[in-house]
């Protein structure tokens, strides 16, 4: 079914068939011929926004039955039952002259972390200063983007299959990851420069454990 909305309340229902490669694979390292059922997902979403105050909040819940995923051994698997994922988020942007402070916080709960792993808390921040270098000709943004999430077993990547699998060995999180950036807009041209992980080595915590 297609999405349908009533104001700021939405409902969506999807029924997804497994791909050919999810059911059939023959390679040097992996071989399987696994008939899979269709996934069924029902999702409800509510959203509230106040544009004049640059504020938005919302929540959504999705229930997926017969979820198809790649297990810790990278073999395809199908969950016998339903998994529920609930998310609550808030976004608030502040502006003081040319200073922009954009903030977004997300809370998530999964009823089965081995099937749908998610961090409990995630935060996304973008702080930058915007100003004219040459009025109506060249404009600059200089700032930092930051990301943070609590520890969880983030999916690992298997290059032999080109898929992400649900590993249960290494927890990722409890570490602020920051990028410095400069963006210039000159007439119709945009130039973007980024220095990734600018805070590397500043904290004793390990990013991947």
Task: Identify the meaning behind each predicted range.
Residues 1-209:
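Exposed, low-structure sequence patches enriched in small/polar residues
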């Amino acid at each position: 079914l297609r999405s349908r909305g009533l104001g700021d309340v939405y409902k969506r229902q999807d029924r997804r068939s497994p791909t050919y490669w999810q059911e059939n694979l023959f390679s040097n390292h992996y071989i399987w011929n696994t008939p899979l059922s269709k996934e069924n997902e029902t999702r409800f979403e509510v959203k509230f926004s106040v544009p004049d105050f640059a504020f938005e909040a919302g929540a959504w819940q999705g229930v997926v039955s017969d979820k198809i995923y790649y297990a810790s051994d990278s073999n395809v698997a199908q969950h016998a039952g339903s998994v529920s994922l609930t998310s609550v988020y808030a976004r608030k942007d502040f502006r003081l002259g040319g200073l922009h402070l954009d903030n977004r916080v997300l809370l998530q709960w999964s009823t089965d972390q081995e099937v749908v792993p998610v961090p409990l808390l995630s935060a996304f921040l973008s702080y930058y200063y915007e100003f004219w270098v040459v009025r109506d000709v060249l404009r600059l943004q200089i700032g930092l983007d930051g990301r943070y999430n609590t520890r969880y077993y983030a999916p690992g990547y298997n290059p032999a299959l080109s898929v992400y699998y649900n590993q249960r060995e290494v927890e990722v999180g409890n570490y602020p990851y920051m990028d410095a950036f400069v963006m210039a807009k000159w007439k119709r041209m945009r130039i973007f420069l980024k220095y990734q992980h600018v805070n590397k080595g500043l904290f004793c915590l390990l990013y991947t454990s």
